[in-house]
């Protein structure tokens, strides 16, 4: 537990003090956010607000995770390193995207194909990494089985190992792409993505720490409901560090935001959710835990699909939070209400995880 507390405090301290330093640097060099002309008109006043705040979130998380893991004697573990690779790798792609937007003063950053290629490369290396380097108990970071609160009977290796690995690569890429897009779309209002993420990673802190104390490697573990997740304590420390970094960043990102996380932060957060869902073997449960993110991305998919099919719009504007803006809701009202919904959903997801464990006792 001391490792989690240390990681949280260190990350929050680094983030809350490092963010204003980054703000001054970005303002000095006039690295501000470009605002789309076709968005809500009230967003035009945000033009020029410093972006790429995700840099501080990433750095604070990585440093605090390393210190927390060393304090707890939990790592750096192979699972933790894989999660950091996915987290930082997608953050770098986002940083390139943000940089191009700023330099060229347009809403389009990296070409979509370039961004997809980058995501595929990072996600594929992560996926392959989860299938190697078992620990002394024979536990791998990943599994070919589709998982809910633990691996299910449905496995991607049904037609042999070779095809199973190929399907696993595709499945992992789908998970990573879906979550990174979901968090990116949610990052549209001051403090929204950061606040929602705190609740999601709060739920995953509980899940990973519970997997630690109920690990099959623990003395006297019940084989009926213990967990074979590899390095759960290290993953819990990462979650605690990320929550601390987000809390510190939110101090400056709350409305009216003095800085945005940008694609740098949004893609990294999506990578963290995806990575945790795979490494904790909760791929489908993550849909519940991160249900607010899912609702936002579904609103965008529904809007586009219905408009292409019928020429009509379901929402006044997508993603979902912009719909409520055009209904006349204040930005702060939307953000706080979405936070409340995200908190309830995240707690429900953690509750489902615990209920599944209880059902096996």
Go through each PLM region and give its residues.
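Alpha-helical transmembrane segments
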Residues: 1-27, 57-95, 99, 126-147, ...
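Flexible loop linkers connecting adjacent transmembrane helices
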Residues: 25-43, 100-108, 319
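Juxtamembrane helix-capping/reentrant segments at transmembrane boundaries
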Residues: 36-50, 105-118, 326
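Short, amphipathic alpha-helical segments
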Residues: 83, 104-115, 138-140, 161-164
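Short loop/hinge segments at the start of secondary-structure elements
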Residues: 93, 108, 117-129
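Membrane interface segments of multi-pass transport proteins and intramembrane proteases
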Residues: 101-111, 148-158
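Membrane-interfacial helix-loop-helix junctions in multi-pass membrane proteins
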Residues: 153-160, 328-333
